[in-house]
C-alpha cells in the first residue's frame, strides 16, 4: 500500500481524527479540475493510520446524505425488524417511477444496488420517528435530525452529514464498532459490494444524489478490501454541474484510488 505523499502535513482541527497523521492533498485538486467540479475527498489508510484530505473546509461541511443514508437506514431496519432479512421482498406499488429499475419488486441487495428510494422510505416508515431518532444518536450519525418527515428527512429535510463523518461511520461499521449485530453488518456489507478487481481488491460503496435543494450534492462513499482486509476508506462529494452531473464522482474516486492503492491498475 502506497503511503500518502504529503503536500502539507498538518493537524486538521475538529475532524475527529486524533492519533492519526492528516495530510492536505493539493495534488488531488487536479482530479476535480479535470471535470470542472468543486468537491472534497477524504481517504483513510488503516495500515499507515493516516488521512488524506482534499478541501479541508468542505470535508467538515454537512450536506444531505441522500441515498448514502440507505446504509444506516438498512442497518437500523434490520435491527428493529423493518427489514426481515435479505430475502424479504418489497412490492412495487405499480405507479410510474423515474427509472425502469425502480418499477419492480426489490430485496435488500437489489434495493441498495439500484438505489430504490421508495423501498427505503417504506423501511424508514416502518421504523418510525422515535426509533429512528434513537438509533441515529447511537450511531452518532451527522446532526441526527429527522426534521422534514420520516420518509424525507435524508432527501430534503434536516439531516446533514459531512464527508469526514461519512468515512468515520463506514470505519465503525467495518470495524464492528457500531451497536448492531454481526448479522445486520454482514447483510449490509453484502449489499454494498460493487466489484472485485483482477488484482484482488474488492470495492464496497454507495452513491447518493440530492434533488432540487439549496445545496445540491453528489456522493460516493465506501471502502476497499484486499483479501478481506480494508486497505482504504473513502468519502467524497461534489457539487453537480449541468456539464458533468454525476459521472465526475466515480471518475475522480477511481483516479484517486488508482493513485493511492493501485485500484483498477
What are these model-derived regions, one by one?
Residues 24, 79-95, 180-185:
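Short, well-structured active-site flanking segments
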Residues 55-60, 104-105, 113-120, 147-154, ...:
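Flexible glycine/proline-enriched surface loops and loop-helix/loop-strand junctions
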Residues 2-8:
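Sec-dependent signal peptide recognition
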Residues 100, 104-108, 120-175:
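Mid-domain, small-residue-enriched loop/turn segments at the edges of structured enzyme/sensor domains
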Residues 20-31, 35, 62, 125-130, ...:
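Structured C-terminal helix/loop/strand segments within mature extracytoplasmic catalytic/sensor domains
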